[in-house]
Design a protein with these regions (language model features):
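Context-gated lysine
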Residues: 1-4, 28, 66, 89, ...
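Conserved N-proximal alpha/beta basic substrate-recognition cap immediately N-terminal to
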Residues: 1-81
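Pocket-edge structural micro-motifs
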Residues: 11, 28, 55, 102, ...
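Hydrophobic beta-strand scaffold residues
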Residues: 53, 98-99
Length: 171
């Protein structure tokens, strides 16, 4: 606890009930599917029994990671979240160069760059919004070629270099 550079130590793997744990760290990559919901519901029960669950289960259920970023608009490019292809086309017309992505994706999967006049724009947008799914379109930032960085806070302090996703040459 007193060493600010070593937050945790790992013991050998063992099985126990959740309520036997002091702390549980919940971090799971998308998608948010039925299994994710069930996991967070079980963790909510452990939390109610006094287990410290880092990344509160209710918060994980309530906030999509991509949508949560929009709480800080000063840190985000212009963004449209919709299921309406016509609205997306107007956004592309306004900004000329955008990135379109599903709300439940991760790791750069199913992210598309669309420029005004792109002949694939319709099929990309229709695929992302299939079945009435919400999607996100953002103004393209050329600086992304240097990578994006995620900020991890521990006890309110940022941990340097927690996660950086740097596009590969063909991405």
């Amino acid at each position: 606890k007193d060493d600010k550079y070593h937050y945790v130590s790992f013991a050998e793997r063992f099985e126990c009930g959740l309520t036997e744990m002091d702390v549980v760290l919940m971090r799971k990559d998308p998608p948010v599917d039925a299994q994710f919901i069930h996991d967070t519901q079980i963790l909510s029960m452990a939390e109610a029994e006094g287990v410290l669950v880092v990344n509160r289960p209710q918060g994980l259920r309530d906030f999509n990671e991509k949508l949560a970023a929009l709480l800080f608009p000063q840190c985000c490019p212009e963004t449209l979240v919709s299921r309406n292809v016509t609205q997306f086309k107007e956004f592309i017309r306004l900004h000329g160069d955008v990135v379109a992505k599903p709300l439940d994706g991760m790791g750069g999967k199913s992210i598309f760059r669309i420029r005004q006049g792109d002949s694939n724009a319709n099929v990309i947008l229709e695929t992302l919004t299939a079945g009435g799914a919400l999607a996100m379109v953002q103004r393209y930032l050329p600086e992304i070629s240097a990578g994006d960085k995620r900020i991890l806070l521990v006890d309110g302090e940022p941990v340097p270099f927690a996660l950086a996703r740097i596009p590969q040459g063909d991405e």
